């Protein structure tokens, strides 16, 4: 019996390890592409609104471009470190480490979508305040329009990122997770031999 299970352990281990590494490689590539997308958006805003800030003499448009540049200073400050972190990411994580990293990523993007709604709402609040504040009407409208634009983009960005990561995990990672059984001795692979289920808990991942 032991001679039978010894090679079975190694076959089963590599049947999990190989697709797990592939999943992590794909997850890292997704993060890199997302950060490049965020960085591209920030760069575009620097160029377009930078020109606008420099050439528009006054009025609502001036404050709109001003806020776009300032806001995307934060975006580029997130995109560059995010890309570097993804580039340095290791695809050789254990299943438990991969699941933790995946759930953390999904949670971050999901929380961010809620924050993005707050940014959009703040933009509408500023526009509303502009109606009763004639002295700062242009500034409030310009800043408000910028927050609506930037918040709207980030909402679509974060929601799209969450959906991409979540679908990717459902397609492969969570299927791998279902082949693992938790027991008092740790994590083990689980098979069905014939019609009777069999589990072995001494193979640690």
Label for each model-derived stretch:
Residues 41-51, 71-81, 85, 115-122, ...:
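Membrane-embedded alpha-helical transmembrane segments of multi-pass integral membrane proteins
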Residues 31, 35-64:
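Long, highly hydrophobic alpha-helical transmembrane signal-anchor segments
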Residues 59-75:
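Loop-to-helix transition at the N-terminal end of transmembrane alpha-helices
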